[in-house]
């Protein structure tokens, strides 16, 4: 059990560092109200998670990659915070578009990931 916790924790660190790197690279895109970086991260994470969960990888690898890396990489809380900020800054239409793209796009990406 401790090994599994260690695998998930190590993976989460890798995922969080990857997310941080992408967020930093996307800083020039901040001139648009749509949070492109978080949307990209969550959609690519959903695609990869779909693949991981239906792959024939050993359980330890699924925990490291799925629970760990994808858990640290994707970010529901940042998405919710960005939705609130969009609403507060009078970008309600963009907030609804972002919500729809995140929800429907995430489901589509998970499905596509299962086909890989």
UniProtKB/Swiss-Prot annotation:
Q: Which reaction does it catalyse?
A: fluoride(in) = fluoride(out)
Per its UniProt record, what Pfam families does this chain match? CRCB
Molecular function via GO: fluoride channel activity; metal ion binding
InterPro entries this protein is in? Answer: FluC
GO BP terms = cellular detoxification of fluoride
Query: Where found, per UniProt?
Result: Cell membrane
UniProt KW keywords: Cell membrane, Ion channel, Ion transport, Membrane, Metal-binding, Sodium, Transmembrane, Transmembrane helix, Transport
Segments crossing the lipid bilayer = 2-22, 33-53, 63-83, 96-116
Quick one: which residues bind Na(+)?
71, 74
Describe activity control: Na(+) is not transported, but it plays an essential structural role and its presence is essential for fluoride channel function.
Q: Hey, what's the signal peptide range on this chain? A: none
Which GO CC terms are listed, alphabetically? plasma membrane
The lineage's top-level taxon is Bacteria
Q: How does it sit in the membrane?
A: Multi-pass membrane protein
Which family does the record claim for this protein? Belongs to the fluoride channel Fluc/FEX (TC 1.A.43) family.
* Record function comment: Fluoride-specific ion channel. Important for reducing fluoride concentration in the cell, thus reducing its toxicity.
Identify this protein by name.
Fluoride-specific ion channel FluC 1
């Amino acid at each position: 059990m401790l090994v599994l916790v260690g695998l998930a924790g190590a993976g989460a660190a890798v995922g969080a560092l990857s997310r941080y790197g992408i967020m930093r690279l996307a800083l020039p895109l901040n001139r648009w109200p749509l949070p492109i970086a978080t949307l990209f991260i969550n959609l690519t994470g959903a695609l990869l998670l779909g693949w991981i969960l239906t792959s024939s990888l050993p359980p330890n690898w699924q925990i490291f990659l799925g629970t760990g890396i994808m858990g640290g990489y994707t970010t529901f809380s940042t998405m919710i915070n960005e939705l609130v900020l969009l609403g507060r800054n009078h970008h309600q239409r963009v907030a609804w578009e972002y919500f729809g793209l995140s929800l429907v796009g995430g489901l589509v990406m998970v499905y596509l990931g299962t086909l890989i």
